[in-house]
């Protein structure tokens, strides 16, 4: 660029500037690269350490679960439980513990006294799968789909129930030694009693229970006597043919919302029920609904126990489609033609149209002194429940001939 000294000098300065910028960029790149590599290296080391610790924790917990289950099998607990199984396998790493137990069996005495040790229940399953998240051992899921057998045995009688289901799933949340929440779901559930041959089928069954806010002790501030809400939903129920005397053998649906006060323990024996009753325990039937063909029953009420620990029921019930029920009671000989005619006349006079447009009638449904009544009409006398001998009733008292 002779003849243009300024242009030559500018080009030289531009080249030097570019070289300087490249050197600065290269130096910064090395510094940043070293810092980034160091941070990545530290992160990888921390991640690797956490992974190793978690792996040790997971497999250590797996070994602990196996030892606890084996201990339960080899050494019966003080509660009288004995357990056995054919094979156990724990998988699910890293997100859960999936405990698969082949041919599990649990056996326990219904009573703790020595004179009543001959009364026991036995559960046998084909396969049980328990799933637990590593970060919360208080929440777990149990899958009992397939075949299950439950036997109640004592010196006088025995019951052998067999269930087959497409799905049986239980989700539970525990707090301390209590079940805070329990969710049960079953699909295509078939239950049969081996000795009587009676069989029940339920297309869908849902059961949910959870503790609600506890009552507070004003003097100590300690919470006590927790209440519990219970929700039951059953659909597509097929009853034994013997029950078709009064109702259709098929029940379309049963819905029920209950609130149990004063901490009723799940084991129904003489001591627990007496304590619950004396503490003022009642079951509030907040709502219920049952549909069988054209007959629909719904309402609310209360359930308690009398001095003999027999049920006391008081329900304000609404009936829709009750006339066919009167005809059926007459057909089976439960009421005569004159009584049926009088019942229809009275029911027609007090019936009102419901929100659905169907005619319905409101009548009290009660159980007192074991007598089940609808309005002024007594339907039947219920068998006496002897809680002192467990929850089982003599077979001859409950068979429907």
Regions found by a protein language model. Give the residues of each.
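Flexible, membrane-facing loop/turn or short amphipathic-helix motifs
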Residues: 105-120, 148-161, 188-200, 236-249, ...
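N-terminal beta-strand/beta-hairpin edge segment
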Residues: 78-218, 288
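Loop-centered beta-sheet repeat module
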Residues: 188-254
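N-terminal type II signal-anchor transmembrane helix
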Residues: 28, 32-70
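Extended terminal
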Residues: 7, 14-17, 21-44, 86-87, ...
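Short helix-loop boundary/capping segments
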Residues: 247-255, 259-268, 293, 307-309, ...
